[in-house]
Amino acid sequence: MKTAIVTDGKYRSSIAAVRALHRAGYQVIVTQTRADVHAVPAVAASRCCAAFRWIDGAAADDSYADRLAALLETYDRPVLFCVGAVTLNTVAAQRERFARVADFLIAPRPVLDALNDKETVHARAQSLGIPVPRQYDGVPPERYPVVIKPHCGEKFGLKAADRYAVADTPEAYAQILARMQRYDPAPIVQDRITGPGIGVSLLLGRDGCLICALCHRRIREYPVTGGPSTCCESFYDAALIDRAYRLLHSFGFTGMAMVEFKGDCLLEVNPRVWGSFPMTEAAQSPFTADYARAAGGMVCPHGRLHPPGRLCSLPHGTALSDAKTYGAGRRFRPAPCVYGI
């Protein structure tokens, strides 16, 4: 039986990955760095997890790459599925080394860095004719509201709620700009686009071919002013899939990514496992299994799409979102809970 190693078991997305890989016939091993958690992650108790392995220290340690590589060497060329961004970047920075002991689909570090830079993505999208929000470079906005954000909020360790802020007036703009300049001397300032958030999740093979695609529309998010999905619904949009693919392909990307839109406008790219990744499991998508098969050199059908209308609700986040919505006096409609953690 082929082995798959799922890293960073503390994240909720690891549960979806473990279930999908187990169902695809893999022996699934979950890892977690001791210093990054206070207790054994819940995924370790899953019947789909064949074994749980601690890694000493933290994922941010300089020695993490050595410890992860040593663990991988104890298995016969496993598939490596990186859930955490730090682990992904660690492997991306030493792809040749890790490729000697494991199979994976991970883009080179410079490609990941470029896709994490919102201004680089904005400029590339414009060159490809993909709609983007109007951006104000070094000049005060002509109209409000505007969104102010650093080039890469994760780089500064910011939580989702702190990675951007909305200014409705010139006074608020000046205050927020000064705050964001603590992280980025030249924050990005764009028109705020209204409407539901849309995610286009793609899996690209080593040759850049599109293997799998899944679209989702946000129903709930937390924070309610803008944050990760807590409840979403799958749907199909060929035009958005094409735009997302052309953008990723132009960077020479390989692996998994979620391209975020509002309406027709492209906002940003998450070139890694994203917050609403459990939707791939709720939608019964072969996303994770196709990743493992393609990483191991198997030929997968190209351009696999999935039926619309599947719901994914993450109970804890949905409860927080509903409570905030109700407390703010907005119309309250409880979201369904259809995906259990």
Residue ranges and their predicted role:
Residues D168-G226, C232-Y245, H249, G263-L266:
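Phosphate-binding site of ATP-dependent enzymes
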Residues A289-I341:
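Peripheral (often C-terminal) accessory segments that flank ATP-dependent C-N-forming ligase machineries
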Residues I188-V189, T254-E260, P301-L305:
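Flexible, glycine/charged-enriched surface loops at secondary-structure junctions
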Residues R220-P223, P228-T230, N270-A283:
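Glycine-rich phosphate/pyrophosphate-binding beta-alpha loops
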